[in-house]
Amino acid sequence: MKYNYYYNNVPGKGLCRNNLIYTSLMNEEQTEFVQWYHNDTEYHKGQNQVVDPKLMDQKWERELIFLQFMEVEAPNMIPKIMDIDTKQRKIKLAVQGPDFWEQAKCSVNGFEKVCPNWADQMLDIISKHAELGLYKFSLHPSSYFVENGMLKSINYFFCYSEEENQIAVKDVLSHVSEDRQKKLFPAMANMGISFEQPEEFFNLQMLCFESFRDDYPSEFIEEAKAIYVRDSRI
């Protein structure tokens, strides 16, 4: 089966890489999406941000751990895992066409046309993460696919468990796009979050939600934040 590079066609920008970490592939029938944890310069068009092989290894391991954890705990909230090739570091997922953001023409205005109750579904997924003690910072709309009207969450390379040691923003900056960084730093200043010092995962989750205010309706962001605020483990 033939696989091609998978891009998002962003208005005003054209074809853009689907994420900053791995190389995204999709078959011509658009039924299989592949996360290839390989630093492909052609795909990333020379804008590779995760160039350290050790860091790529860590992202691959984190994806494996938390995606498979979700497969056990909430299989209805992720795409079906068709295959995991540990040698080539590829994860093959069953999908029904392009990702949620792409189907919405890369605009929040198209979300309801693609999935009328997208907000409720996304909040359910976030609630499940909170219930499981997870903090997932890859929240871009392209981190979801749609299957029979149901959202499916992907990109667990940027997910942490409450049981792990704290991290600092500087440790994960390579995962954050330059556009996102422009929103991140003012939010950090407003929230009193350090760039250098390890921070509580709860605070980093709140920071993450704030950095996505331009990608989602404001009321959605507030509801997402409230999930972690009211979670019993906080």
Task: Briefly describe each language-model feature range.
Residues N8, G12-L64, Q68:
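ATP-binding glycine-rich loop module of kinase domains
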Residues S24, L93-V95, F145-V146:
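Conserved hydrophobic "DFG−1" position in protein kinase catalytic cores
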Residues E32, M77, I91, K152-S153:
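Protein kinase-like catalytic core scaffold
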Residues M56, E71, I78-W118:
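Conserved structural core of kinase catalytic domains
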Residues M122-A130:
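Short C-lobe core helix of eukaryotic-like protein kinase catalytic domains
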Residues H129-V146:
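Catalytic-loop of the protein kinase fold
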Residues E147-I234:
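C-lobe/activation-segment region of protein kinase-like
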